[in-house]
């Protein structure tokens, strides 16, 4: 590794630790020429995750979209924003740990809904009303009945 201070290629590793929840390795290095220390990170070559939308179009996965959807669903609910970010990161981690590079927007929506259902029923219903695009009041009531009856098939 080339020293960022003097450009010398002879450096030695003085400390190695796991970083970023085990997805990276942090190394402290020391230049053998100028004795200055610096940090490097080693990460897997991150393959982009592709979302296949309902209309068949594709776009890059964006964790921020999950987070903003959670924020809207949980607006004026007693839920910390840090918890919502944690959920978005958990979903991202789960998706990246899969072998597939593509995921459908439907799968992501179901992952969000299952977590919201455990977190806050009002937020779950809010999210479901937008995500499931209920055609009428009766289909909305059916979803509420499922929720009240313990959640079969939802």
UniProtKB/Swiss-Prot annotation:
The UniProt record lists the keyword Repeat: no
Gene Ontology BP, a term: negative regulation of DNA-templated transcription
Reported cofactor(s): Zn(2+)
UniProt keyword list: ATP-binding, DNA-binding, Metal-binding, Nucleotide-binding, Repressor, Transcription, Transcription regulation, Zinc, Zinc-finger
Cofactor: binding comment: Binds 1 zinc ion.
InterPro entries for this protein: ATP-cone_dom, NrdR-like_N, RNR_NrdR-like
Domain ATP-cone per the UniProt entry, residue ranges: 49-139
One of the record's GO molecular function terms: zinc ion binding
unnamed ZnF: 3-34
Entry similarity comment: Belongs to the NrdR family.
NCBIfam families in the cross-refs: transcriptional regulator NrdR
The protein's name: Transcriptional repressor NrdR
Species name: Carboxydothermus hydrogenoformans (strain ATCC BAA-161 / DSM 6008 / Z-2901)
Gene (name only): nrdR
């Amino acid at each position: 590794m080339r020293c960022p201070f003097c450009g010398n290629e002879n450096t030695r590793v003085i400390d190695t630790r796991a970083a970023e929840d085990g997805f990276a390795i942090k190394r402290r290095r020391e230049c053998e020429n100028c004795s200055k220390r610096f940090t490097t990170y080693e990460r897997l070559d991150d393959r982009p995750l592709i979302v296949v939308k309902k209309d068949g179009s594709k776009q890059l996965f964006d964790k921020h979209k999950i987070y903003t959807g959670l924020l809207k669903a949980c607006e004026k609910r007693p839920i910390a924003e840090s918890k919502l970010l944690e959920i978005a990161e958990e979903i991202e981690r789960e998706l990246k740990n899969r072998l597939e590079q593509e995921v459908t927007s439907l799968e992501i929506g179901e992952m969000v809904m299952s977590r919201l259902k455990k977190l806050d029923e009002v937020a779950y219903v809010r999210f479901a009303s937008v995500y499931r695009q209920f055609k009428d009041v009766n289909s909305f009531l059916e979803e509420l009945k499922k929720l009240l009856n313990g959640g079969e098939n939802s």
